[in-house]
Design a protein with these regions (language model features):
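Non-heme di-metal
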Residues: 1-289
Length: 289
C-alpha cells in the first residue's frame, strides 16, 4: 500500500487551463492506492493498548464525519461535465466511503461501541462539497500532526500506525485535489458569477474558522460525556495523553503537511490558508504554550 508519487515538475500552469485540468484529474487517478478495509490484517493488541484505543472518545464523531463527507463527495461528482475531473471526484467519494468502512472494520474488530449514523443526503451539491472540502483542509492538517504525535509517543503500536498510513496520505491527496478544484471551478464560471463564488467560499471558510475558534476556547474545560464533539482533530492531542504544547503541535502539523505534500507534482497549487494561519500562530505564541 505504498504511495506512488506523481511526476514532479517545476514549471507552473495557468489555473483553469487544459493542462491544469488534465493534471488535476490524472494525478488523483495515478496515485490511487488499492486496499480493502474488510480484508485488513488488524494487529493483536495488548490489554493496555486495547484499553487506550477503546478509551479514545472521538470514534463516534469520526464515524459520523466520514458518513457526511463520503456521501457529500460522491454526490458532488454530478457537478462536473468534464469526464476526467468527474472520474477523480467519483474516486475521492469511493475513498471517503472506504475510510468509513475502515472505521467500521476497526471498531468492530476491537469491539469499540459506535452507532451507525443515518445516511447523509446533501441538500446543495456545490455548497455542501465546499463546506466538506474546507472542513477537511482544517481537519487533515491537524490530523497529520496528531498522527505523527501518536507515532512518536508510542500511543499507537507500530503495526496499527502502518495500517493507517495510507489513510493519512489519502487525506493529503484529497485536500490537494480540493484546493485545485476550487480554483479550477472558479475559472470555469462566467466572469459575473466568480465574485459570488468567492463570497460563498469566504463565508464557508469563516464558518469553519469560527467553529474551530470556539473549540479552541473550550480546550481544557470539562467536555460532555460520550465524546469529544466536533473538530476532534483540534483537541485529540489531549485524548492521546501526550505532553505537548500547542507550539510543538503546530510545528509537527506544519512539518508533516510539507512532507506529505512534497509527494506530488509541484505544479499543483498547495493549500495555503490553514498552513498560513498555523505558521502565524507558531511565530507569535510562546514555545511554552
Amino acid at each position: 500500500m505504498s504511495v506512488v508519487p506523481a511526476n514532479i515538475e517545476s514549471e507552473s500552469l495557468a489555473v483553469g487551463s487544459a493542462e491544469h485540468r488534465r493534471l488535476l484529474g490524472q494525478f488523483f487517478l495515478d496515485t490511487f492506492v488499492d486496499y480493502v478495509p474488510e480484508q485488513m490484517q488488524w494487529p493483536e493488541l495488548t490489554d493496555e493498548e486495547l484499553a487506550r484505543l477503546r478509551g479514545l472518545p472521538f470514534w463516534q464523531e469520526a464515524v459520523s464525519t466520514e458518513n457526511v463527507t463520503s456521501n457529500t463527495v460522491a454526490a458532488a461528482a454530478a457537478l462536473e461535465a468534464d469526464p476526467l475531473v468527474r472520474k477523480a471526484i467519483e474516486l475521492q467519494g469511493f475513498e471517503e466511503m472506504r475510510h468509513a468502512r475502515l472505521l467500521v472494520a476497526l471498531t468492530s474488530h476491537y469491539r469499540i461501541a459506535v452507532e451507525s449514523p443515518p445516511r447523509f443526503t446533501p441538500r446543495s451539491l456545490e455548497s455542501d462539497f465546499l463546506f466538506a472540502g474546507f472542513g477537511e483542509c482544517f481537519d487533515s492538517f491537524f490530523a497529520f500532526g496528531l498522527f505523527a504525535l501518536a507515532r512518536q509517543s508510542g500511543f499507537f503500536p507500530p503495526a496499527l500506525v502502518k495500517v493507517f498510513e495510507p489513510v493519512m496520505q489519502e487525506e493529503a491527496r484529497h485536500i490537494l485535489f480540493f484546493v485545485n478544484w476550487v480554483k479550477y471551478r472558479r475559472s470555469q464560471l462566467p466572469w459575473w458569477r466568480r465574485p459570488f463564488f468567492r463570497l460563498r467560499c469566504a463565508s464557508i471558510i469563516l464558518k469553519q474558522v469560527a467553529s474551530r475558534v470556539k473549540t479552541a476556547r473550550s480546550m481544557g474545560k470539562p467536555q460532555p460525556a460520550g465524546g469529544s464533539g466536533e473538530n476532534f482533530t483540534l483537541t485529540a492531542h489531549q485524548d492521546l495523553g501526550a505532553e505537548v504544547t500547542l507550539h510543538r503541535l503546530l510545528e509537527l502539523c506544519l512539518r508533516e503537511n510539507e512532507r506529505r505534500m512534497a509527494e506530488y507534482d509541484s505544479r499543483l497549487k498547495r493549500p495555503r490558508l490553514v498552513p498560513g494561519i498555523a505558521r502565524l500562530l507558531y511565530r507569535v505564541i510562546p514555545a511554552s504554550v
